[in-house]
Regions:
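Glycine-rich phosphate-binding loops of nucleotide-dependent enzymes
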Residues: 2-247
Length: 247
């Protein structure tokens, strides 16, 4: 069974068709890239999948169930995680406390700041930090982290909910080449360990063709290519429209 099934999704803003009849599926464990220039509809498509937007036509199925009635929070609890181009963390809390809060939220429970001093989730939070290579920064304020480490922290926050599907919006934006490859190697390793599917947007073609097992290409809201990286790289329309663009 497909983990994610997107069927003929449509979403317009005024007269602009941001997502225009997009259909595709993802299997558990797949690592796929969604590419296209700014304005192609990538973020809108992610917002339709995670519940921040409602489609005007079409539907999204997750593990065979329609997501129509699910809020964004419910989709997170059911196994759809997301990271953003601009990392969303609590800057004034420690790295460990950030993950403790994420673990509590995954359980549908609120924590006060005082609770973090004794909360039993500290051990689980430490384990997540070890998975993303941040255990040595556990007691540091999130605001003190280097940019690449902030992206790792956001990944740990997303993993706290044990997602079966992780949507990643430009995970390596702003990183040097070595940082990009290190982060993507970590993501692929973590996905393989849990059979988690990953769908990521990315402008760096070295990342796309170095790590995606499948590439989907959007143009003006339409899916114009979908296949293994070698086939997409050889597609003449994709070459003409996108592969020379890095912004």
């Amino acid at each position: 069974m497909n983990l994610l099934q997107v069927e003929r999704l449509h979403r317009s803003f005024g007269g602009v068709r941001a997502v225009d009849g997009v259909s595709f599926t993802l299997m558990a464990g797949e690592i796929a890239a969604l590419i296209g220039p700014n304005g192609a509809g990538k973020s809108t498509l992610f917002n339709l999948i995670d519940g921040q937007l409602t489609p005007q036509a079409g539907r999204v199925l997750f593990n065979g169930e329609s997501l129509t009635a699910w809020s964004t929070a419910e989709r997170t609890r059911r196994g759809i995680g997301r990271t953003f181009q601009v990392a969303q963390t609590f800057a004034t809390l420690t790295v460990l406390q950030n993950v403790q809060l994420a673990l509590a939220a995954a359980e549908g429970r609120a924590l006060g700041i005082a609770d973090l001093l004794w909360d039993l989730r500290a051990e689980a939070a430490s384990s997540l930090l070890a998975q993303v290579g941040l255990q040595q920064h556990a007691s540091d304020a999130a605001a003190s982290l280097a940019y690449g480490d902030i992206k790792r922290l956001e990944l740990a926050l997303a993993l706290a909910a044990k997602p079966r599907l992780l949507l990643m919006d430009e995970p390596t934006a702003g990183m040097a080449a070595a940082e990009r490859f290190a982060l993507m190697q970590m993501i692929v390793r973590l996905a393989g360990a849990s059979n988690m599917a990953v769908l990521f947007t990315e402008h760096s073609m070295d990342v796309v063709f170095g790590f995606a097992r499948r590439v989907l290409v959007l143009s003006r809201g339409r899916l114009i290519a979908d296949g293994v990286p070698e086939a997409v790289r050889a597609d003449t329309e994709v070459q003409r429209l996108y592969l020379g663009e890095e912004a």
